[in-house]
Curated annotation (Swiss-Prot):
EC class name: transferase
GO biological process: one example: methylation
Species, as recorded: Xenopus tropicalis
Biased composition (Basic and acidic residues): 376-387
Keyword Nucleus assigned: yes
Cellular localisation: Nucleus
Disordered as annotated region, ranges: 184-221, 342-428
Comp. bias regions, Basic residues: 347-359
Name recorded for this polypeptide: Histone-lysine N-methyltransferase EZH2
This protein's record includes keyword S-adenosyl-L-methionine: yes
Family of this protein: Belongs to the class V-like SAM-binding methyltransferase superfamily. Histone-lysine methyltransferase family. EZ subfamily.
Biased composition (Polar residues): 362-372
Lineage of producing organism: Eukaryota, Metazoa, Chordata, Craniata, Vertebrata
Main localization category: nucleus
Domain CXC positions: 505-607
Amino acid sequence: MGQTGKKSEKGPVCWRKRVKSEYMRLRQLKRFRRADEVKSMFNTNRQKIMERTEILNQEWKQRRIQPVHIMTTVSSLRGTRECSVTSDLDFPKQVIPLKTLTAVASVPIMYSWSPLQQNFMVEDETVLHNIPYMGDEVLDQDGTFIEELIKNYDGKVHGDRECGFINDEIFVELVNALAQYSDYEDDEDGDDNQDDERDDTAKDQDDNMEDQETQPLRKFPSDKIFEAISSMFPDKGTLEELKEKYKELTEQQLPGALPPECTPNIDGPNAKSVQREQSLHSFHTLFCRRCFKYDCFLHPFHATPNTYKRKNNEAANDGKPCGPHCYQLLEGAREFAAALTAERIKTPPKRPSGRRRGRLPNNTSRPSTPTVNVLEAKDTDSDREAGTETGGESNDKEEEEKKDETSSSSEANSRCQTPIKMKPNIEPPENVEWSGAEASLFRVLIGTYYDNFCAIARLIGTKTCRQVYEFRVKESSIIAPVIAEDVDTPPRKKKRKHRLWAAHCRKIQLKKDGSSNHVYNYQPCDHPRQPCDSSCPCVIAQNFCEKFCQCSSECQNRFPGCRCKAQCNTKQCPCYLAVRECDPDLCLTCGAADHWDSKNVSCKNCSIQRGSKKHLLLAPSDVAGWGIFIKDPVQKNEFISEYCGEIISQDEADRRGKVYDKYMCSFLFNLNNDFVVDATRKGNKIRFANHSVNPNCYAKVMMVNGDHRIGIFAKRAIQTGEELFFDYRYSQADALKYVGIEREMEIP
């Protein structure tokens, strides 16, 4: 019975009680610690104020008091009255003028907002940060508004989570506190079985003493701790997720610890020789390949490995030696470089997925041409790269076998296949030591410059092109190949292009007419070696494939741009017809690609991406609140400004819209079926343009380089100083509720 009771105390119920008690204790300690910090800071600030006050008092005592000139009469001053100051003491009577200020109209109410020059995508707010104050009259009319608002956030309000809130700091402290219970129970179990396991315990103690220097940290907490925390806080993750989170948080607390993906500075003393993918990890993670910015806030998605490959060579080798000691003068060097080039531009063979290319046995005869060797090295390396997730052990085994083959001189003479081994009568390769920084930089550059070893040597700066070439030969079985784009179709003929172009223009018109109200956000498709059929996400969303998609450039669903030679401001332009701006990478004849003179561009359909906005002035409106006015005259259909703000989801827009409706002020603008632009908190000055049923501007959602953006254009010719209006597309009831004053129509 005693043993049964003892086991029950260690069950899940007991651990849940421990989690709750330790959690409340840590929360209380944190509140006490916070209160002590506030008291200490208050006393410190008060002491500083007293010291500063004492210094100022000493300075005032040393200064001479300047007498104030007292006016004897104020009757001659217009708009002033005479006021006298008397005292019950023996001070003389003082007469001062009192000037009355004229009444000034107050400025309209404006809520704080942050200026933006481009859209800013934000995540959904699942917690209500504050309960908005609407005034007593709003609560009297609709007493259930606050309750319904909280229900929209699933009852989660900021600050109202005493029993369910656990941050990273409390989580680590909670696990460490519960680990003491686990250690105590382990000690009790060890005492019960001390007679039976004395030898094993002594052996473990000896092992712990030996590993004390290499493993100074204590053992990892038990799984039952994370299981109990997961049961008490189910929204924080499962057992495995909590274990991984605890491991990451504790590793970050170690002095000098680096993230697992982080590599030492390539220019620092601790530079290491790593693979290309590891060196470029930060670049691939932070660099946006759609807007060419680091840490982009408009496209918060992670690129796939297929987007890392290059489709063209950065600097082609001209074939001329760079000097008397150039690598091209070595025997077999040109053949090796030509083999690399031929293999890079060659279409890779299509092998069944999930199967590896087996290595030929040692007794199998193989051709000894450099091309075949490079092909095998690249294929094997490609398998190694693909097998890092599934078959790392077999890759290491193959690499060791290759090293054995290279080190064996007898096998090298009979089965040598690299050009460096095909020249027995020339001098042996130089034995040059490569530092970690140089090796890492070489692996980064080889993916861009390929076989141009002269250019790579100039960029490295510390090695000759011959040394770079010899290092490339040694690295031929390690460097991952850069696979070129797989093109299954031959180049189109000119007549066929014209026919496809006409069919494409008709397809644009059909899409515009049939699904004008169904516009979805664009995401680049990525299905290697698969055509853009009904399973393609671009086709499903009824979007064209853009230049960011990983499909072939000959894809039938890809938008090819226009070939206009005019201003691209009529429906004769395919881009204008498809409600798109001309792409400077696709539209090469209309002037959209002319970037030298941005003010005199012949194409008039690229204003949003170039930021060719007009000068706007902010002033009180004649209709409601603030208004926006134009400084310079504009012509009809001319671009005025882009409507910028936060890009939020439709669900988030519904939650925010309930609050904006009560304020009777909304800056929400539908972007597409997936997202909405909200200029309430962040935006630009065009957010102050008011609504009118007879506007002088109009808004148009356009596709600009793969992004939907809102442009404000002139509906008619607008003169200097006119206030800008556009139609909010309110319903009749909403228009009466939001806008009670309509601007006066100007009679020409």
